[in-house]
Amino acid sequence: MRIEEDLKLGFKDVLIRPKRSTLKSRSDVELERQFTFKHSGQTWSGVPIIAANMDTVGTFEMASALASFDILTAVHKHYSVEDWNAFTSTASEDVLRHVMVSTGTSDADFEKTKQILAQSPALNFVCIDVANGYSEHFVQFVSKAREAWPTKTICAGNVVTGEMCEELVLSGADIVKVGIGPGSVCTTRVKTGVGYPQLSAVIECADAAHGLGGMIVSDGGCTMPGDVAKAFGGGADFVMLGGMLAGHEESGGKIVEENGEKFMLFYGMSSESAMTRHVGGVAQYRAAEGKTVKLPLRGPVEYTARDILGGLRSACTYVGASRLKELTKRTTFIRVQEQENRVFNSL
């Protein structure tokens, strides 16, 4: 047993220090980035935000809506091959280039993903997703996927420490997914005692991945546009959002009605709700590590997307970053004990 004494930080523990700026308007900020990925060799340009691969967020409808903002969607793994065929036959190539195909690590997952990728050459992203990215089996699957799809850009996770981030990059991941337990409907930290504050995880993993030519996506922990800015400021190349994009018309959650008001269900992918829906219930040997919440309906996702992008542009103007790419270099974090004046929050 050992204890690490240095303090680890989440998004709520810091603010970004403002700096002198020559920017005259938020409209001067360029959010689009261009990446060339280490292993696939593919070049992609767009806004590096990703809708999470949850079945109440990462839907075909969400992908179609967010593509117009140049935002990616990691489409959840529970669509059938037939569902994918219907989608790829009608979606434009521009939409498909903003889509990640999500997969687990079983042999059946591998075969299914192979069939999906064969449907369109525009499907260039694969998201290999497990809750615990520290297993040898997972690393071996990433290597297998890289060998099978040498020209596809592979995103793999989740991990939170530098050494495992390096392992995944060396095994074939172009992008490492960072985050254990920070999600709004994730209960891993309270069920297991395992986790890592998200901002510190991002800073550590970005340093590790960038040293090898890899990239990271910060997955989880963002509750407001300012958190997205902090994730980019901490070194994330991409930011994945779940709860912030849930509850919309495109989110795919079940709608329930209580006292005349409509709500949409949103749940973690290790929750009892998710396991009951997809595998028939919680296995006897495990515990659910997610919760289910009811969100008031939030309308079309376009308004939320504009709010997030607007907040990000504003953050860049406060530190003098004319491009999102510059935000990390322009960021100085200050530790704080409060984020906002909450006097009217209960109204």
From Swiss-Prot:
Superkingdom, natural source: Bacteria
Catalytic activity annotation: IMP + NH4(+) + NADP(+) = GMP + NADPH + 2 H(+)
Thylakoid keyword on record: no
Pfam families with a match to the protein in the record: IMPDH
Record-annotated active site: 186 (thioimidate intermediate)
Keyword annotations: Metal-binding, NADP, Oxidoreductase, Potassium
GO cellular component: a single term: GMP reductase complex
Residues that bind NADP(+): 108-131, 216-239
Binding site for K(+): 181, 183
GO terms for biological process, alphabetical: purine nucleotide metabolic process
Its EC number(s): 1.7.1.7
Role played: Catalyzes the irreversible NADPH-dependent deamination of GMP to IMP. It functions in the conversion of nucleobase, nucleoside and nucleotide derivatives of G to A nucleotides, and in maintaining the intracellular balance of A and G nucleotides.
Subunit structure: Homotetramer.
Family (UniProt): Belongs to the IMPDH/GMPR family. GuaC type 1 subfamily.
PANTHER family: GMP REDUCTASE (PTHR43170:SF5)
Stated name of the protein: GMP reductase
Species of the source: Citrobacter koseri (strain ATCC BAA-895 / CDC 4225-83 / SGSC4696)
